Amino acid sequence: MPVDAQVLLAHVLGVGRAWLIAHATDPLPRDRADAFFALAKRRREGEPVAYLTGRREFHGLDLDVSPAVLVPRPETEGLVECALERLPAGRPLAVVDLGTGSGAIALAIASERPLARVLATDVSHEALAVARGNATRLGLVNVTFAQGDWYGALPADAGPFDLVAANPPYIAAGDSHLDDGDLRFEPTRALTPGGDGLDALRAIVAGAPARLLAGGWLVVEHGYDQSDTVRTLFAEAGFETIEARRDLAGIPRTVAGRKPGQAEIRVRPPPAMPESST
């Protein structure tokens, strides 16, 4: 049975996938079979499994998701790891996650750095409701939330921050990928800012130095073909120690940069990433 089908059947039955394997020959009640086939039909039409089940695992956290938020992706776990390398444990740090969506990045950081104060923002009230619900269910009390567009969401007394993280919309308007597969069902505003896809990244990079402590870090996710441009934006904004990372598929996916000044935090060496011609 394909993985998606296993996940949907486990969801319908309220059991784990291991239970399914152990009971593979058990008869399926008619009402559960009908529910499964209804979900399977929606999946064949392209609807994401995470929307059908209402759940997605991310960095070891079981998150609620809905069509109000982007489905958290494995590639974004690389951004979280990059951020954690710049946030030493055991220190009372200040972090902001811009455009939090389901809260995946903010909650992953908060769970790994319990002494950090993490602020999660989003322009969407519906997305913030999902993120707040996840924080409550996971018992993460070191996360707060604010509504608004990028830095416009920050309360007057917020910051300066040790680290700014963001996985903003970065797909160009008219990109054919927006009409493919799962993306057709996800919120357009979370996927593309319009134009060449870089407007949100431009705003986030340009505004970061004023919100960061000296020696603080900005870490962003970007599109598969945007690494060089994003690194240029970092350099133009005055960042140093600019580092590009590849995701597990070898595709350039994350850029981090340090605000000049006396370092407030130390970075442990990142793991070596294989080169790729992709």
Segments the model singles out, each with a brief description of its role:
Residues 159, 169-200:
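Mobile active-site "lid"/loop adjacent to the S-adenosyl-L-methionine
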Residues 195-258:
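Conserved Class I SAM-dependent methyltransferase catalytic core
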Residues 7-85:
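Conserved AdoMet
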Residues 83, 109, 182, 204-208:
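Class I S-adenosylmethionine-dependent transferase superfamily signal
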Residues 74-177:
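Conserved SAM/SAH cofactor-binding pocket of Class I
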